[in-house]
Amino acid sequence: MITNSQIIITKDIDLYLSELVPTLPLHTHRIFQNEEENKDNFKIEQAKKVIKEAYIASSESKYIILCGNKFELEAQNKLLKILEEPPKNIIFIIITTSKSNLLPTIISRLPHKYIKSLNKKEYSNHNIFKKDLKDIYLFLKENQRISKND
């Protein structure tokens, strides 16, 4: 389970979201993304809603999930302060397809990790108990996506 704010970089935002949500405690998360036709861009309107939601007090951890292939510059600037100093019990999860979609100042404020989402069909093809060490190693190498600089 995720215990601190972070940036998730994945090729398929919807698939990762479908894997993440069941791992979170029930009724503790809010997802913010552009619901318009071109829902790739995270806009200033979503940023304002995120800030408003973050300041609603909660005695338990609340996960605020921001999804977008691209984040408008104005939206990112609006979020800077709250990402740097989040209210008590607020955990931000930014999900995007590329690190370059975010300002360097946002990337410097939150840890980030690359996730290769596997669909259920891919999972079912790999029974770890029937694999030898070499096959497991090759599978892990094939699915690893971390650069030297990270």
Q: Which sequence ranges carry the predicted segments?
A:
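CheY-like receiver
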Residues: 72, 80-83, 103, 110
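Clamp-loader machinery-focused feature within the broader ASCE/P-loop NTPase space
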Residues: 1-77, 81
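Charged, glycine-rich active-site and insertion segments that engage polyanionic ligands
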Residues: 1-31, 88-91, 96-150
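Loop/turn-to-beta-strand initiation segments
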Residues: 59-64, 87-93
